[in-house]
Every structure is written in structure tokens, then in C-alpha cells.
Design a protein with these regions (language model features):
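Acidic, metal-coordinating catalytic segment for phosphate/diphosphate chemistry
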Residues: 1-36, 40-42
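A sequence-level detector of short linear motifs
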Residues: 15-18, 48, 151
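Nudix hydrolase/Nudix homology domain
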Residues: 23, 60, 72, 99-151
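Active-site segment of metal-dependent pyrophosphate-handling enzymes
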Residues: 43, 53, 77, 85-122
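Active-site acidic-Proline motif in GNAT/NAT acetyltransferases
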Residues: 68-74
Length: 151
């Protein structure tokens, strides 16, 4: 299997180059785009997935419902739909872009495209995760600072 290639972007999201996953996650701070999907049910609860213990970044922590990298040559909406199908087996058509922001960590620099959707059907997380469930806002507030959520 060949290594994944990600687009490198400027702060506006324009593609300015490309790099491997390893290069982007090595502390180089190369700005690359990612997609996140926040799934709410009609009760106002937020779905979080539990990251696999096999992940190299934030293993075993509760995270946004869908989060993934944009492949080189792929547009943002296509990446979001692909990641949502891969991780949860659902169709995210009709989701809404909420915000675009930069995320910095000691290992990487991401341009995050954050989307939301209201979804009340069954969700079957892939084996790429260690499960998932809907959380009330009180549960999320109680979990903040406990070391179980991703930043």
C-alpha cells in the first residue's frame, strides 16, 4: 500500500503543494485540510466516536463523529462524504458547513472544515473506531478536563 498524499493549502484553503501523511504529521507544521462532521440528534445530543487504540494520534479518546484527511486531488465535500461512509456507513448529504479554522498541535497544522447534520437513524461505526454513542451536553461538559476527549 502506498503512503497517503495530502494537499498542502494556504490559510484560505487554496492548494499550494502536496506532502505525504508522514511529512504532515512529523512536526513539520505543513498546513493540510481535514473534514469534521458533528452529528446531532433531534434531542440535541452530539454523537462522538471512540478513537481506536491503534491510532497514532489521540488513541482511545472520544472524538468528533467523523474526522479525516482530504486526499490530494479530492475536493472538500467529496472527502466529507467519503469519510462519513467509511467511518459510520451513513450518507451525510445535506450537511451544513459551520466553520473553517486552523488547528495547531505539536505534530501537525490542520485547516479544519467543520460541518454539522441532524441525524436520527441508526449509526454503525466501522471497525476503524472503538464504537460511538450520542452524548448529552451535560455529559460532554462533565467529561471536559478528564482526559477522555480529544482537544
Amino acid at each position: 500500500m502506498s503512503e497517503e498524499i495530502f494537499p498542502l493549502v494556504n490559510e484560505q484553503g487554496d492548494v499550494v503543494g502536496k506532502a505525504t501523511r508522514r511529512e504532515c504529521h512529523s512536526g513539520s507544521k505543513l498546513l493540510h485540510p481535514v473534514v469534521h462532521l458533528h452529528i446531532f440528534n433531534t434531542a440535541g445530543e452530539l454523537y462522538l466516536q471512540k478513537r481506536s487504540m491503534k491510532k497514532d494520534i489521540q488513541p482511545g479518546k472520544w472524538d468528533t463523529a467523523v474526522g479525516g484527511h482530504v486526499d490530494f486531488g479530492e475536493d472538500i465535500p467529496t472527502a466529507l462524504l467519503r469519510e462519513t461512509r467509511e467511518e459510520l456507513g451513513i450518507n451525510a448529504e445535506g450537511c451544513e458547513l459551520v466553520q473553517m479554522y486552523e488547528f495547531h498541535s505539536d505534530r501537525e497544522h490542520e485547516l479544519v472544515y467543520a460541518y454539522k447534520i441532524v441525524y436520527d437513524k441508526d449509526i454503525t461505526p466501522s471497525e476503524e473506531t472503538d464504537g460511538g454513542r450520542f452524548w448529552s451536553m451535560q455529559e460532554i461538559n462533565d467529561a471536559i478536563g478528564q482526559g477522555i476527549l480529544t482537544p
